[in-house]
Curated annotation (Swiss-Prot):
HAMAP family: UV_endonuclease. This is UV DNA damage endonuclease. Its cofactor is Mn(2+). GO terms for molecular function: endonuclease activity. It holds the Pfam family UvdE. GO terms for biological process: nucleotide-excision repair; pyrimidine dimer repair; response to UV. InterPro entries: UvdE, UvdE_bac, Xyl_isomerase-like_sf. Its EC number is 3.-.-.-. Disulfide bonds: none annotated. Belongs to the uve1/UvsE family. Keywords: DNA damage, DNA excision, DNA repair, Endonuclease, Hydrolase, Manganese, Nuclease. Component in a DNA repair pathway. Removal of UV LIGHT damaged nucleotides. Recognizes pyrimidine dimers and cleave a phosphodiester bond immediately 5' to the lesion.
């Protein structure tokens, strides 16, 4: 395996393309609940089948465009974690061969897969019902990753933010008790409001959970001038130490629309932090998706002589 300090970073596509190539279907909860049980099953069978086909196409798209990192949409299979309704689980079981084939397509193309579920998942909420629904949702996502044939390691990361602020001790205490399909893939990311990397690092170290560093969030949280602040490099390296092996390290990359303090993500990446130059895996969180990746490849350290 190439050293993290020697490799040219791999740029990751997040879920969709701006173009029509990778676009998934969904259904609203209100629409779903208006259906009869038979109609629900038929609806999810059609929707899940379509999304698996699109996912299989995403593997081909990544391979064709030399993209070696892809974030799975956490909305691939709506209603899969719906309490008291096992329709989604039954449909996904029926489609298990197709789902596994899609996973093999990514593996065969050398594409690493990750997932970053919705922010309503708050494992350390002070409300028991939210904690319960959060574990249920994470378990459903882990089931999808299992169905794709993905390893139960941070190579196939299942990423969360720290959750409810001021409850870091509660988060650290519950991680060891998470179901193995979740716990063994779990990673934590700093955010711009509740949890800085300094607050997450002790949790990551205590639980063996890798830290995904986001420089944009760090700049906003600490009100820094830009992503060239020396602390960005410090946190790249400190986060890297939580990854085993360090060559698996993932970071997030984004720019603000109207400057470093703007939380909104820009269409393209104009400012690439020099601290990321030797990071092996970079998820590009730009609105321009594949367009942002193409533009980045014209910049150092990606531009080929």
């Amino acid at each position: 395996m190439t050293s993290a300090c020697e490799a040219v970073p791999q740029l990751g596509l997040v879920c969709l393309t701006v173009g029509p190539e990778v676009r998934f279907r969904t259904v609203t909860l209100s629409r779903y609940r208006a259906l009869s049980p038979a109609e629900r099953e038929a609806k999810l069978l059609d929707l899940y089948s379509s999304n698996i086909k699109t996912l299989r196409g995403a593997a081909d798209y990544c391979a064709a465009h030399d993209i070696r990192l892809y974030r799975l949409s956490s909305s691939l299979f709506p209603m899969l974690d719906l309490a008291g309704d096992d329709t989604g689980a039954a449909v996904l079981t029926h489609l298990a061969p197709q789902l596994l084939e899609a996973g093999h397509a990514f593996t065969d193309a050398g594409v690493r897969l990750l997932m970053h579920p919705e922010q309503f998942i708050v494992l350390n909420s002070d409300r028991p019902e939210v904690r319960e629904s959060s574990v249920r949702a994470m378990s459903a996502h882990a089931r999808v990753m299992d169905g794709l044939g993905l390893a139960r390691t941070p190579w196939n990361l299942l990423l969360l933010h720290g959750g409810k602020g001021g409850r870091g001790a509660e988060l650290a205490a519950l991680i060891p008790d998470l179901p193995d399909p979740v716990r063994l893939r779990l990673g934590l990311e700093n955010d711009e409001r509740a949890y800085s990397p300094a607050e997450l690092l002790p949790i990551c170290e205590a639980t063996g959970t890798p830290l995904v560093f986001d420089a944009h969030h760090h700049v906003v949280h600490d009100k820094l001038p830009d992503q060239e602040d020396p602390s960005v490099r410090e946190w790249v390296l400190r986060a890297r130490a939580t990854w085993q092996p360090p060559e698996w390290q993932v970071v997030h990359l984004s720019n603000g629309i109207e400057g470093p303090q703007d939380r909104r993500h820009s269409h393209l990446i104009a400012d690439f932090p020099s601290a990321y130059a030797d990071v092996p895996w970079i998820e590009v969180e730009a609105k321009g998706k594949e367009e942002a990746i193409a533009a980045l490849r014209l910049m150092a350290p990606f531009k080929k002589d």
